[in-house]
Amino acid sequence: MPREIAMYNLPDAHGHFGPYGGTFVAETLSHALDELRDAYARYQHDPEFIKEYEYELKHFVGRPSPIYHARRLTEHCGGAQIYLKREDLNHTGAHKVNNVIGQALLARRMGKPRVIAETGAGQHGVATATIAARYGMECVVYMGSEDVRRQAANVYRMKLLGATVVPVESGSRTLKDALNEAMRDWVTNVADTFYIIGTVAGPHPYPMMVRDFQAVIGEECKVQMPELAGRQPDAVIACVGGGSNAMGIFYPYIDHASVQLIGVEAAGEGLESGRHAASLTGGSPGVLHGNRTYLLQDEDGQIIETHSISAGLDYPGVGPEHAWLKDAGRAQYVGITDKEALQAFHDLCRMEGIIPALESSHALAYACKLAPTLPKDKILLVNLSGRGDKDMHTVAELSGIDL
């Protein structure tokens, strides 16, 4: 049984979630983080700030996003009812924009005219470029060159929106390398630059701040589910790369002990193959990108190359709050392979007329595995974190089709 987490109030003042989180950064960044922490503490409860944030979410993003009962998919899988939280319907096509708006509003109040971001699948990059255009800010996005190749359409979108995209050639040329480069930029240009991190990782206050801006997802669900289904779900399921869409839907439910929280990681070609990105199910605690969390590392603490069909889950770490929720027994984490995710992707397209992101397809795949083991009156709520337009090339390529 999960240990009872009495009224959840993490992180502590130093950004710790139990033994995870914290601030492991070069001295050169500690001033910037102190400044950010102070600004966030000052504005997070400021009525004017909240009013502007909520206005943008409603009128620019199109929130609240609906919840949809996937009846044909439910029938196909058998068992429990499957509901989808439609983050794919947000402007820019994913959950990422919820967080970017919050951080960009903070950047403006801090007088920083330049924003930088890292991106894997390109969704966070597109959201950042979009909001930078909306507010007239300079924008630079760092992206691993391998991801630039995989996500050509999103790269072009960012450029259309006025951002400069910098391909990163170091390491595995994916998300972790882009994050390293973005941090280097921030150290150099800290006076006029705000670093918009796209997930619940990084040094404090990022994991807390990103979670708070994404929590709008779960807050809406708590209102919508009783209206739609008559009660709260039995389980909430979300994919986990860094883990911001999952934290956004989990956080408001943490104190609801009857709601099971399930995070779905990328098992790639299978956990035993070594080619995966499942930090929580296949990793061990260590320090990466300024925080202590579960990582995919070898005996010497060197980061292992990760693999996933989905660029957005292809990250060797995970948000520290997920690490804590796993150890505390409040959330459970499972793996879904490339093959299973691809099957769920095709199923949703054909049965519901919704093309999901490959990331979200991992959560869907697990819901379809879990549903038949449960009675028909049980309810599974899946966070459909993004739409699949960006994955057309990847999926077509796997089917031997050249777009």
Curated annotation (Swiss-Prot):
PROSITE patterns: TRP_SYNTHASE_BETA. Its EC number is 4.2.1.20. The keyword Lyase applies. SUPFAM superfamilies: Tryptophan synthase beta subunit-like PLP-dependent enzymes. Pathway: Amino-acid biosynthesis; L-tryptophan biosynthesis; L-tryptophan from chorismate: step 5/5. Keywords: Amino-acid biosynthesis, Aromatic amino acid biosynthesis, Lyase, Pyridoxal phosphate, Tryptophan biosynthesis. One of its GO terms (cellular component) is cytoplasm. It catalyses: (1S,2R)-1-C-(indol-3-yl)glycerol 3-phosphate + L-serine = D-glyceraldehyde 3-phosphate + L-tryptophan + H2O. One of its GO terms (molecular function) is tryptophan synthase activity. The modification N6-(pyridoxal phosphate)lysine is found at residue 96. The keyword Amino-acid biosynthesis applies. Its cofactor is pyridoxal 5'-phosphate. It is an enzyme of class 4 (lyase). HAMAP family: Trp_synth_beta. Tetramer of two alpha and two beta chains. Belongs to the TrpB family. PANTHER family: TRYPTOPHAN SYNTHASE, TRYPTOPHAN SYNTHASE-RELATED. The beta subunit is responsible for the synthesis of L-tryptophan from indole and L-serine. This is Tryptophan synthase beta chain. The gene is trpB.
